[in-house]
């Protein structure tokens, strides 16, 4: 780079002058007389002071350094207008050079203040070229502007202010640069080359920085997990406090109601003779809300098909709801009234009655199937052998014969009546254990069904098929009897009436119920996973029962049902007394059903979720966006971690979104007396014969 040439430049060493404390700057500035000023600067003056600092003693070749610093003191000549200065000749040329250099300096400062990476024209003038390190390098710059308050110079004053405001925006970075000699630079490069060669020969496996980052990431994950646990504990404590306050308020209300009513009613059906209830005719409409009933209701959801599900629910409407009853050809109708329209002398339905009513549809269905197959030449005769009678005992089929002439109870969900002419046409009723559906295996016009052979020899025994559910119902009846005996003893000791205390056992110890609910909920979740229960059933149950005091009986029934199913699976083979289709024939079959359900949920993700929601779901569930079959990966991770309640809650939320569950509260809690798993129903191509049947599944 060629050095800057200037005639008036001079270089003077001031070492000797500094020691003598006397030094004067030689006069290099040019001054001249103009119309505006008698002594006007006709050139810029720059004074550069360079200071070098080095050690007084020799410390070695590597440590012999010298610090060099420079300071520029610049006196800029003022700009002038030729029309006002009335300059000519030499004064005019000097003014032109001054204005040109000031214009170049203003351009450089304006572009530096903008902070852009555009080209900076330092070479437009010698002034900007000399001041380049001070303006945009590692230096600190201070500028003093001189203005004229005269009105005639207002434009020059405005330009000067603009120049000063731009100079304030210039950012510099003052730092010390290390200038190395050629020998020192060669030695430094040789050392660096040797270091790089050694690293290539012996590569470092992992740096300490990467290890430190991994440790920090692990700490962050642990802290996030602890925060989630603390939040869940806080929410749980708040829910416990609310339940406790609500239970105490309900208990006080029950005591006030019991003090007002002392009328006794005759013993109700299914209760010991010593147990009495208050006459409901003496209780007002508000007091009748205290009764907790278990009833079965009919829900027609198919739009044009007569599909019937067995369900249970609390009737909240004061109006009467009449339902047609009929079991495969029975044309008689029975009305089922809600609890507010029930006769005043009739007691509420007990749990024992409800469990008995659950058993009756299966018994009646089997009897009707047996009678229809005896009248048809195309079907095999379903009979009872002596060996079957010995296995089932003497109660179940005797009860079946007695129930033939007994009218249906008000809590029973009636099966839809079928046309009379359907008795003349027959085909085999096929219940698929894999899909929990009833399908017809005969011709297109066949509407009579029979059970599929449970064994390879083709013999079907109706009484042995119903012993499994009979044992389960008997077990639940025994549980209900113990529950009532305990309630009776406690209320006799306290002198209270049973009919006015709808929440037995739970209201007596409200503080223990939240802990008991958590324990039972965890056991139920683990049993769901062990028995391969439907994910939809888990979701409905988990979202519906939040730990209220009235949920205790449903939690107990679900726990008993799952324990019964687990014990059945633990025997290693399907028991001969299990209902065909009501229980999964083996753990392998249950696992296959669960796998098909996960595939169904994976297909629902494409329909229910948008692209952004699917990507968010993949990220949330730890599925790589670049992997294949991402939806199936998410579906396979649902309800897998039984110990993590947050995982269970997220799984239930996602499944509910995929199946279109808007408000879990719309589902009646009593429907969980039976199973709530969705059932696929076979459809007929001809709309005239589009009968569809449904049966509850206990798996």
Curated annotation (Swiss-Prot):
Residues 1-170 form the Kinesin motor domain. The keyword Kinase does not apply. One of its GO terms (biological process) is microtubule-based movement. Residues 276-298 have a biased composition (Basic and acidic residues). Residues 264-275 have a biased composition (Low complexity). One of its GO terms (cellular component) is microtubule. InterPro entries: Kinesin-like_fam, Kinesin_motor_dom, Kinesin_motor_dom_sf, NACK_C, P-loop_NTPase. Residues 249-345 are annotated as: Disordered. It comes from the Eukaryota. Disulfide bonds: none annotated. SUPFAM superfamilies: P-loop containing nucleoside triphosphate hydrolases. Residues 313-338 have a biased composition (Polar residues). PANTHER family: CENTROMERE PROTEIN E, KINESIN-LIKE PROTEIN KIN-7C. Belongs to the TRAFAC class myosin-kinesin ATPase superfamily. Kinesin family. KIN-7 subfamily. This is Putative inactive kinesin-like protein KIN-7B.
């Amino acid at each position: 780079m060629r050095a800057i040439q200037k005639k008036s430049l001079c270089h003077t060493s001031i070492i000797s002058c500094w020691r003598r404390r006397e030094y004067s700057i030689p006069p290099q500035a040019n001054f001249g007389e103009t119309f505006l000023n008698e002594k006007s600067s006709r050139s810029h003056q720059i004074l550069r002071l360079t200071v070098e600092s080095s050690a007084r003693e020799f410390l070695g070749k590597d440590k012999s350094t010298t610090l060099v610093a420079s300071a520029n003191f610049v006196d800029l000549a003022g700009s002038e207008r030729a029309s006002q200065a009335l300059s000519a000749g030499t004064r005019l040329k000097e003014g032109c050079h001054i204005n040109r250099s000031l214009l170049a300096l203003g351009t450089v400062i304006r572009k530096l203040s903008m902070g852009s990476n555009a080209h900076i024209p330092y070479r437009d003038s010698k002034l900007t070229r000399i001041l380049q390190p001070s303006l945009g390098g590692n230096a600190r710059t201070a500028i003093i502007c001189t203005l004229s308050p005269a009105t005639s110079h207002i434009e020059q004053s405005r330009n000067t202010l603009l120049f000063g405001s731009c100079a304030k925006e210039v950012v510099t970075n003052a730092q010390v640069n290390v200038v190395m000699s050629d020998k020192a630079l060669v030695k430094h490069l040789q050392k660096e080359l040797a270091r790089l060669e050694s690293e290539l020969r012996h590569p470092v496996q992992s740096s300490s920085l990467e290890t430190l980052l991994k440790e920090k990431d692990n700490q962050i994950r642990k802290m996030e997990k602890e925060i989630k646990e603390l939040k869940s504990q806080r929410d749980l404590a708040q829910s416990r406090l609310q339940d406790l306050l609500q239970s105490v308020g309900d208990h006080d209300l029950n005591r006030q109601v019991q003090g007002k009513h002392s009328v006794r009613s005759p013993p109700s059906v299914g209760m010991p003779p010593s147990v009495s209830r208050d006459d409901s005719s003496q209780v007002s409409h508000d007091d009748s809300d205290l009764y907790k009933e278990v009833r079965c209701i009919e829900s027609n959801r198919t739009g044009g098909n007569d599909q019937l599900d067995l369900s249970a629910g609390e009737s909240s409407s004061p109006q009467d709801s009449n339902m047609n009853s009929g079991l495969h050809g029975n044309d008689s109708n029975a009305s089922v009234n809600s609890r507010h329209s029930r006769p005043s002398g009739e007691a509420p339905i007990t749990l024992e009655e409800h469990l008995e009513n659950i058993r009756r549809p299966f018994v009646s269905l089997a009897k009707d199937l047996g009678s229809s197959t005896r009248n048809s030449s195309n079907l095999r005769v379903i009979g009872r052998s002596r060996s079957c009678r010995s296995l089932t005992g003497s109660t179940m089929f005797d009860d079946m014969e007695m129930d033939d002439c007994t009218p249906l109870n008000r809590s029973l969900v009636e099966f839809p009546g079928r046309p009379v002419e359907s008795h003349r046409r027959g085909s085999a009723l096929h219940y698929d254990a894999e899909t929990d559906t009833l399908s017809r295996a005969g011709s297109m016009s066949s509407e009579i069904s029979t059970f599929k052979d449970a064994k390879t020899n083709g013999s079907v025994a109706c009484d042995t098929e119903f012993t499994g559910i009979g044992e389960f119902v008997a077990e639940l009846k025994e549980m209900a009897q113990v529950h009532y005996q305990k309630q009776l003893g406690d209320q006799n000791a306290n002198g209270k009436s049973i009919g006015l205390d709808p929440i037995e056992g739970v209201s007596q110890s409200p503080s223990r119920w939240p802990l008991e609910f958590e324990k039972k909920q965890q056991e139920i979740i683990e049993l769901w996973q062990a028995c391969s229960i439907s994910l939809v059933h888990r979701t409905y149950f988990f979202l519906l029962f939040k730990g209220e005091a009235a949920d205790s009986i449903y939690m107990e029934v679900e726990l008993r049902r799952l324990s019964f199913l687990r014990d059945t699976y633990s025997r290693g083979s399907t028991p001969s007394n299990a209902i065909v289709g009501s229980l999964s024939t083996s753990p392998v079959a249950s696992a296959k059903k669960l796998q098909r359900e996960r595939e169904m949920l994976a297909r629902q993700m494409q329909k229910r979720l948008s692209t952004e929601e699917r990507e968010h779901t993949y990220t949330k569930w730890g599925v790589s966006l670049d992997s294949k079959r991402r939806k199936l990966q998410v579906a396979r991770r649902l309800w897998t971690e039984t110990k993590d309640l947050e995982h269970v809650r997220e799984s239930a939320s996602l499944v509910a979104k995929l199946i279109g569950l808007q408000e879990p509260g719309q589902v009646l809690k009593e429907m969980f007396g039976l199973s709530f798993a969705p059932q696929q129903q076979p459809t007929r191509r001809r709309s005239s014969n589009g009968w569809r049947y449904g049966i509850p599944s206990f798996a």
